[in-house]
């Protein structure tokens, strides 16, 4: 795995050997393996760990483990502790979403304050498969199926080609130790249900699914780019500004192929959520309304008025 990791990083990333990289390290299997691999590959790291305090003593033990790992390898460890109440019970936001928001804000702070060239997370092929299946169940459209990217805005994911089983076997062979989060064993979250009961079936396929998935997602990503380019052209033809907002001309839109698909794509720019059927609004009587996350859409004869 070490050689494959090196080959992948050489091909995919262009990191400056003289500038540090921040490794997001929870203390779990994936981030511990990432830390050790990057220790051999780059050797100029800062470990960043966030303690949410959600698991009491176990959270503190995770923190202590990461601090010890950093000390053993000779790296600075930056730790942030947040009150559990700042993560739980946030209106309109799940615990996982809030934790992610806090975590990435912290990682960005560490990156900027240490003049690092990026943040590394331990997302791997199984995470990508789980995300694909979750988005498939949510009808997110092409964009949601294109998967986790190898890098986005200073966040790098060098373990993405590797399956969890490969990572585990490598860690066991090396004799690494890591922390286990008991909450990962429950079926309380959709991702865990997929991880425990659906993803294992993919490992029984004859062809390695991670390669097939990446190829499929590359095709979907290209299709999404083509669709977005076409949406931009259509938008310029059918959407005009008014004093109160925007005016979408349904008659002009109907001259294009698959107008309902285009309509949904155009309205996602204005807060349309998966599952909201803007096509029904287009067929409704004047005066019908649809409220997105950010806008009001009002049917007025042959147009839809879009107001913030």
Q: What kind of region is each of these model predictions?
A:
Residues 1-135, 165:
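ATP-dependent adenylation/nucleotidyltransferase module used to activate substrates
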Residues 2-30, 46, 50, 82-84, ...:
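AMP-forming adenylation/ATP pyrophosphatase catalytic core
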Residues 14-16, 76, 117, 177, ...:
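Short coil/loop linkers at secondary-structure junctions
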Residues 37-41, 113, 201-204, 266-269:
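Active-site catalytic microenvironments for nucleophilic, acid-base chemistry
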Residues 52-56, 184-189, 253:
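Short histidine/acidic/glycine/proline-rich micro-motifs that form metal-
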Residues 65, 69, 106, 170, ...:
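Amphipathic alpha-helical segments that form well-ordered structural scaffolds
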Residues 118-122, 127-216, 246:
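Catalytic subdomain that performs nucleotidyl-dependent activation
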């Amino acid at each position: 795995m070490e050689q494959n990791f090196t080959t992948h990083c050489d091909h995919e990333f262009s990191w400056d050997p003289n500038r540090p990289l921040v490794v997001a390290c929870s203390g779990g299997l994936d981030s511990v393996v990432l830390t050790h691999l990057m220790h051999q590959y780059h050797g100029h790291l800062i470990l960043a760990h966030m303690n949410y305090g959600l698991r009491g003593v176990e959270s503190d033990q995770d923190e202590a483990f990461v601090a010890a790992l950093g000390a053993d390898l000779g790296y600075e460890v930056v730790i942030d502790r947040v009150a559990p109440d700042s993560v739980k019970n946030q209106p309109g936001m799940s615990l996982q979403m809030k934790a992610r928001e806090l975590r990435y804000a912290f990682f960005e702070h560490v990156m900027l304050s240490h003049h690092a060239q990026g943040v590394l997370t331990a997302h791997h092929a199984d995470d990508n498969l789980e995300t694909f299946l979750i988005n498939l169940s949510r009808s997110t459209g092409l964009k949601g199926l294109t998967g986790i990217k190898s890098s986005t805005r200073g966040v790098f994911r060098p373990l993405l080609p590797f399956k969890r089983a490969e990572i585990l076997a490598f860690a066991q062979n090396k004799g690494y130790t890591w922390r286990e989060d008991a909450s990962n064993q429950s079926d309380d979250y959709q991702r865990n249900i997929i991880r425990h009961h659906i993803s294992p079936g993919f490992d029984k396929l004859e062809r390695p699914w991670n390669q097939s998935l990446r190829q499929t997602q590359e095709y979907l990503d290209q299709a999404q780019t083509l669709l977005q380019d076409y949406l931009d052209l259509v938008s310029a033809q059918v959407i005009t500004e008014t004093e109160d907002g925007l005016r979408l001309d349904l008659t002009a839109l109907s001259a294009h192929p698959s107008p309902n698909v285009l309509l949904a794509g155009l309205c996602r720019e204005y807060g349309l959520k998966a599952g909201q059927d803007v096509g029904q609004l287009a067929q409704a009587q004047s005066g019908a309304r649809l409220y997105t996350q950010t806008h009001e859409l009002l049917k007025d004869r042959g147009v839809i008025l879009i107001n913030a």
